[in-house]
């Protein structure tokens, strides 16, 4: 760079002592020298010190210019980049892409350089090549056929045939749902004024649907309109979906009325009276041995409902343990429905006439389940013995709760241990004579505590 140019421009010296001019690129000689030193293997920091050029300038020339584009010429300052997508380059890119549709953009770029169509300064980048292929070589198919540029540049062996199976969209005036591109048209929502029109044209829509189904095999198939079904046709189609998949979950009113007709109240009352007559009281005393199963009367017909009126049982003894009950059926009902006091009358369950076999009726199955609940013990649980606060059972009563072969009712004959001797704890005499065994008599006295030790000082 001449010396007078430095004085004429707004120049100066950088941190390394090199001259520069504001707003002007680095001279071509310095740029070429930077590239030559880089080819020799000199590091960018050493190039910066030798040529007295800032490190940022060296990195930009090598990285952003030479290594990417292969050129060391400076870019245009104060203007846009020169256009690389010239008509000649676009035509060549189109020819390469038609000859080899799977050709990559970087391969097209290398071929442009190899054939001399572009040089290192005018060759388009990979992104520019992809943009040219996307916008100018491959045209979208929804454009008119006469104005499509791709059809003009196609080879004679490649032609585009329009599909006759695609029906053009109907005009907004003929669509009862409104404009196709409106919100109502896209969502399929009918306009307020179209309900009356659909009711008037229901016959025409049904005829149109039948004609379309008949002519679908001969002519081009038309799209099925969303308003082809009238309300008269939609009601029988929606009936199966309105039914409950689980009919027992919710009982309909008609189903309830039918069951009320099957079980009238006078018939239920007469059935309850017959059920009372079949119950015979039993005076069988309840034994103390609960391990043996008790026998209970079972109703012969499990489906005949009945109500039970139980009198107050007579207690034979004044102890807290009842020894006998007037009826064995009272035991069953007392266990199942423990909230009913003695002497109370169980009313007939006329409030639920349609669910006689499910709710509120005592049947033979209920008695059987009550007998299982009255068994000696529940599975996995020992017999209940009340605490001292609740009362106590005699030893004979506790022994009667289990089988006699398993436990003895007699008390233990030996006397309890008042003190535990070493002979009882260690029956083997060799353990007592072991050097590792220290008896309580041979143990030394405890060492004096800290307080005691300080007292002796």
Curated annotation (Swiss-Prot):
Residues 12-69 are annotated as: PAI subdomain. One of its GO terms (cellular component) is nucleus. GO terms for biological process: cell differentiation; positive regulation of DNA-templated transcription; positive regulation of thyroid hormone generation; regulation of thyroid-stimulating hormone secretion; thyroid gland development. It comes from the Eukaryota. It is found in: Nucleus. One of its GO terms (molecular function) is DNA-binding transcription factor activity, RNA polymerase II-specific. Keywords: Developmental protein, Differentiation, DNA-binding, Nucleus, Paired box, Phosphoprotein, Transcription, Transcription regulation. Residues 9-136 bind DNA. PROSITE patterns: PAIRED_1, PAIRED_2. Residues 160-183 have a biased composition (Polar residues). Residues 160-223 are annotated as: Disordered. The modification Phosphoserine is found at residue 304. Residues 88-136 are annotated as: RED subdomain. PANTHER family: PAIRED BOX PROTEIN PAX-6-RELATED-RELATED, PAIRED BOX PROTEIN PAX-8. Thought to encode a transcription factor. It may have a role in kidney cell differentiation. May play a regulatory role in mammalian development. Interacts with WWTR1. This is Paired box protein Pax-8. It comes from Pongo abelii. The lineage of its organism: Eukaryota, Metazoa, Chordata, Craniata, Vertebrata.
């Amino acid at each position: 760079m001449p010396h007078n140019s430095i004085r004429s421009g707004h120049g100066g010296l950088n941190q390394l002592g090199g001259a520069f001019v504001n707003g002007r690129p680095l001279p071509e000689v310095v740029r070429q020298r930077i590239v030559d030193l880089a080819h020799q293997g000199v590091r960018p920091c050493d190039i910066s010190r030798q040529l007295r050029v800032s490190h940022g300038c060296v990195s930009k020339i090598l990285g952003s210019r030479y290594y990417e584009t292969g050129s060391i010429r400076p870019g245009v300052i104060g203007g846009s980049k020169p256009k690389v997508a010239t008509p000649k380059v676009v035509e060549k890119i189109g020819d390469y892409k038609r000859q080899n549709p799977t050709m990559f953009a970087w391969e097209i770029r290398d071929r442009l350089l190899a054939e001399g169509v572009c040089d290192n300064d005018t060759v388009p980048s990979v992104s520019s090549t992809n943009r040219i292929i996307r916008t100018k070589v491959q045209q979208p198919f929804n454009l008119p056929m006469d104005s499509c540029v791709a059809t003009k540049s196609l080879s004679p062996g490649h032609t585009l045939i329009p599909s006759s199976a695609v029906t053009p969209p109907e005009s907004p005036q003929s669509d009862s749902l409104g404009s196709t591109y409106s919100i109502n048209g896209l969502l399929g929502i009918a306009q307020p004024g179209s309900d009356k029109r659909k009711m008037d044209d229901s016959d025409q829509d049904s005829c149109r649907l039948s004609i379309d189904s008949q002519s679908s095999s001969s002519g081009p198939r038309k799209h099925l309109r969303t308003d082809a079904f009238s309300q008269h046709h939609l009601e029988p189609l929606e009936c199966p979906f309105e039914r409950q998949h689980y009919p027992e979950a919710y009982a309909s009113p008609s189903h309830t009325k039918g069951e009320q007709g099957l079980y009238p109240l006078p018939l239920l009352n007469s059935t309850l009276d017959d059920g009372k007559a079949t119950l015979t009281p039993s005076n069988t005393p309840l034994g103390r041995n609960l391990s043996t199963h008790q026998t209970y009367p079972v109703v012969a017909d499990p489906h005949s409902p009945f109500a039970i009126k139980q009198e107050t049982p007579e207690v034979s003894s004044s102890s807290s343990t009842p020894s006998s009950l007037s009826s064995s059926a009272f035991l069953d009902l007392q266990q199942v429905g423990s909230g009913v006091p003695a002497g109370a009358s169980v009313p007939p369950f006329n409030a639920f006439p349609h669910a006689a076999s499910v709710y509120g009726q005592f049947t033979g199955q209920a008695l059987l389940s009550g007998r299982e609940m009255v068994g000696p013990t529940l599975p996995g649980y020992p017999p209940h013995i009340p605490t001292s606060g609740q009362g106590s059972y005699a030893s004979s009563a506790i022994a009667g709760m289990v089988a006699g072969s398993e436990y003895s009712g007699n008390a233990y004959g030996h006397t309890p241990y008042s003190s535990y001797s070493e002979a009882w704890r260690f029956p083997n005499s060799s353990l007592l004579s072991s050097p590792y065994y220290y008896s309580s008599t041979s143990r030394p006295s405890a060492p004096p505590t800290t307080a005691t030790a300080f007292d002796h000082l």
